[in-house]
Design a protein with these regions (language model features):
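Helix-to-beta-strand junctions that scaffold the AdoMet/dcAdoMet cofactor pocket
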Residues: 120, 215-217
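Mobile active-site "lid"/loop adjacent to the S-adenosyl-L-methionine
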Residues: 133, 168-209, 226-233, 255-258
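Conserved AdoMet
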Residues: 31-89
Length: 450
């Protein structure tokens, strides 16, 4: 790997020669592969090496073809870089009661799915990505994870300024120069320049300034990057503390994890450097906004309600249906957790929402057609529909959105599963089963290549 001479000069100066030499040695090795399990759908494999700072994170001995695993598509686990799982320590040490949280730069969904697993019960997570295609991927991953207390938006950061004091916790995994991903991303190596670093610093501060009013006084900000330089890391944290008015917070960590403390100044911050930690480059700091007040409690806007007949039928499709209120957006019926009903309606009204709560069904020709998000949800009442177990080849055919034959299955809507994990829905009409898997999510790779 040939690195830019200015990058080498700057990083040696920051790391010191001994740490830099160990870092360069690690860059010549293959990246580690890690996953994080969704324990609402699948037990973590305890035969695998654990990611020490994440309860359900595991290292894999080699990289399999994830696309060929039906459980990957069912949301049973997420392929995530191990270092970035460190956000779990922030939640465990500073979030002890339900919160309203924002993952501002959330695509493709690693931190979002992690937060959906570890935030205290009763929390609401808003995940945002302004780029349309990346936002679609984010929504797909959030839906597959199956937590109904989730909203996905596609807004620019400045749009959140209108939601004053709306969030207890904001995570900004900021766009950065990507130095920490050099081992995995040759494009990041080629594109690196001091000028790009300077542009990233400017953009990061704009993002933080624009979203600051949305964090309540006393709320917690998590700032992270996947880069090494001080300008985007320690210097930016110092700027947040001084210019925006925030108190940096320390985390309790184990020495054996190999996490490196801040390399500049005395502000608490945490660096993951290949050669010292098993993962890619990562930086994280935690700050508390000055002051103290509760999050804003919005008044619920008016919303269209589904008729009683519709509501009664869909209630049978849910576990604990009494915990939800229902709204109708066009022909789509959505369940919203009662505790977040007002907040979710405000978001639907003010923001560019791609996904909200639990979409349950579409109304077509006066009939209710269950939608894929219901099949993915942990709130699904699995006894509401017949379940058909598929062999691996059948499961992959379904995920390619091919027409299936289910001669032994009852007619009507059925749940399709692989090894107990629900993959989605199909409508069995006897001689064939109409595939209801979302067309935009289908596997595009040729089956012979899997």
């Amino acid at each position: 790997m040939e690195l830019n001479a200015r990058f080498v000069e700057r990083t040696v100066s920051l790391f010191g020669e001994k740490r830099y030499a160990r870092f360069i040695e690690a860059l010549e090795k293959e990246p580690v592969v890690s996953v994080r399990y969704n324990v609402h759908k699948m037990l973590a494999d305890d035969s695998l090496e654990r990611v020490p700072w994440a309860e359900y994170g595991r290292y894999l001995p080699q990289r399999p073809v994830f696309t060929a695993d039906p459980k990957f598509h069912a949301g049973c686990y997420y392929v995530q870089e191990a270092s970035s799982m460190f956000i779990e320590q922030v939640v465990r040490q500073y979030v002890s009661s339900p919160v309203r949280a924002l993952d501002l730069c959330a695509a493709p969904g690693g931190k979002t799915t992690h937060l959906l697993s570890i935030l205290p019960a009763g929390s609401l997570l808003v995940s945002n990505e302004p780029m349309p295609l990346r936002a679609q991927v984010l929504a797909e991953n959030a839906i597959k994870w199956g937590n109904p207390a989730s909203v996905v938006t596609k807004n620019v950061p400045a749009d959140f300024a209108s939601l004053r004091n709306f969030f207890d916790l904001i995570v900004v995994d900021a766009p950065c120069s990507g130095e920490g991903m050099f081992r995995k991303d040759s494009f990041a190596v080629e594109q690196w320049s001091v000028g790009n670093v300077e542009q990233c610093v400017k953009r990061q501060r704009e993002i933080l300034s624009s979203v600051w009013d949305a964090l309540r006084p006393g709320g917690v900000l998590v700032y992270s990057t996947c880069t090494f330089n001080r300008e985007e890391n320690e210097d930016c944290v110092a700027w947040i503390a001084e210019e925006l008015g925030a108190e940096p917070l320390s985390l309790n960590i184990e020495v054996e994890w190999g996490v490196t403390s801040a390399l500049v100044g005395s502000i608490p911050a945490y660096r993951f450097i290949p050669g010292y930690t098993s993962g890619e480059g990562f930086f994280l700091a935690v700050l508390r906004k000055g002051g103290d007040s509760a999050v804003a409690q919005p008044r619920a806007p008016r919303a269209q309600q589904p008729v009683a007949k519709v509501r009664n039928e869909i209630c049978s499709w849910l576990q604990l249906s009494g915990e939800y209120d229902f709204v109708q957006e066009g022909d789509r019926v959505i369940a919203l957790p009662k505790e977040h009903y007002a907040a979710m309606l405000v978001l639907l009204q003010k923001m560019r929402v791609l996904h909200c709560g639990l979409p349950i069904a579409d109304i077509k020709n006066n009939k209710l057609i269950p939608v894929h998000a219901l099949a993915m949800s942990r709130a699904l009442n699995r006894s509401a529909f017949p379940i058909v177990e598929l062999e691996r080849e059948q499961a992959l055919a379904y995920l390619h959105r091919e027409t299936l034959s289910l001669p032994d299955a009852p007619k009507g809507v059925v749940l399709l599963a692989f090894d107990g994990a629900v993959l989605g829905l199909a409508k069995n009409v006897g001689n064939r089963a109409n595939n209801l898997y979302p067309a935009e999510w289908r596997i595009r790779k040729d089956p012979m290549e899997l």
